[in-house]
């Protein structure tokens, strides 16, 4: 409530002979006088008094302001805004309190601004309407505690979520409804989806769906694709979504050229950087990737405020000529970065992955790199960053994300090729409390051993690029199934990692464990018997990871290289130097529907100071499909026991393609070829057969992106075997990120 009483002299200035201030209790009189900008003896007209009124209300210290200038006496009557003690939210079930608090603007134990709070209530209503459930009623009431303190009670009456009963497509002649349902994120209600929310109607989700359909069609040559309409047929049972499409004709790439409006930019060699072949099927993804490649090259050459803009020239023969224009960009300043869709993940987790901040100058290349960094967190299915110009010098960045589950609670049992029958309990949360902290607790009991471990990792320590983690573990393994020994290990490790640059990360670690080999069979090889007993392993390690992948968890293109060394002997009984290497490349094939990967892994270990490498620290190439666990590598001639090796190399070529099954199953078929070997034993007193020959295998498998992680089963046949090798047709396993 605000008042401005008209002056006794409306058009002429009155001299102020006295100033009387009342109603201020917490706010000092000095503060009020500082806002007045009026002194005794000063002539004040109506427009000046109006300015006083505006300053007092703009301070947001007062809920009511009354001014009266009569007979030279300026009376300032104030009513202060109360102090907010607490905000209570009731009735919210579909949206967490943490997510609501991100939208509501308030600060406890601070001055309560009712107008600002009302605006945030409006924002909360909009968020519910677009992202959670429509027709949600939200109200609030102010509960006075005493004269100067209030509580606020927010009541949310969530409507029943609108269920998507069916999804239909019109105008699609090339791709079936089943294929297109795989493309979008909205899902039909199904018995396979009892507990999720993907089948709930959401405007925000539909916006993602529109973008995904456009990327899908234009990624497969349909340059003229358009979504002509989206019909929502609602009834008491839910809603039927009808996407009305215009597929258009299929185009291929024509001529590709690069031109520049800036004469000082050298572009003669830029066309060589474009990896688009004339005659290839038009692909909007390839257009964007090559634009980013050109932009990156230009940035490296010092041209920071340029952009690469594709221009299309379709012809009647189904070809699209493509021209990349190198243009000067006006220097826009980022006034605000808005983030939406993150109902669980804290804004700070996303903002710290942004290479641009508010008040920075806008750079398109940094926007693209920021999107990749956010995706690599592993918390989101989709990330879109759009810019909206607000005037000729400023813009707003809108970051829209679609969150994915980041935690699992698993109680399961089954059979694994490397552990036998097992029972497993695990809790994994990769985004603990929305902070990006990682917590893993795992308890596994198997016929061939047990594994108990707990790991905690915190990213961005002190808001830097440093990640720190620690773990403790106990594991034991019964190798008696192979006629050898029992093994147990208890210990822990600590690690820190640091980003040397955006795509290069350094990892440093220390581990300490007490390893025991016991219950050795009497006819076991002498090298195994000599390893018996308890030894202390104290080791430091480092690794470097060059990450040029589009997505660390599910890569579709790009490459990655990882190598490192582990040095044991910083105290303890065991002395060795171990080296590990992994490199892989990924590319989308078959019109972007499948992914071809080539991966090479290698490792080498050797002892020093007169020590050899114990059997517990050697490599066992159990990952090679077509061969049994302990199936290849050096073997004891007399007992046929596997001894492990000091060197291995394994190369894998694989293609994964989506299967024509219900989208809920999320199954892919994999076809692969592998070649590798395991060799080298430096501690042995017995006769050993050690073939250096390369083995190879070929096979196929099923890959399931399950709630418990990416699982797979493979059927493989060994093509080339070594003497004494053990083959196995079927293997089960869990897929780890690159």
Swiss-Prot record:
It is found in: Cell outer membrane. Keywords: Cell outer membrane, Membrane, Repeat, Signal, Transmembrane, Transmembrane beta strand. Residues 14-81, 82-159, 162-248, 251-329, 332-404 form the POTRA domain. It holds the Pfam family POTRA. The keyword NADP does not apply. InterPro entries: Bac_surfAg_D15 (IPR000184), BamA/TamA_POTRA (IPR010827), D15-like (IPR039910), OM_assembly_BamA (IPR023707), POTRA (IPR034746). Its main location: membrane. Residues 1-13 form the signal peptide. Belongs to the BamA family. HAMAP family: OM_assembly_BamA (MF_01430). NCBIfam families: OM_YaeT. Part of the Bam complex. Part of the outer membrane protein assembly complex, which is involved in assembly and insertion of beta-barrel proteins into the outer membrane. This is Outer membrane protein assembly factor BamA. The lineage of its organism: Bacteria, Pseudomonadati, Pseudomonadota, Alphaproteobacteria, Rickettsiales.
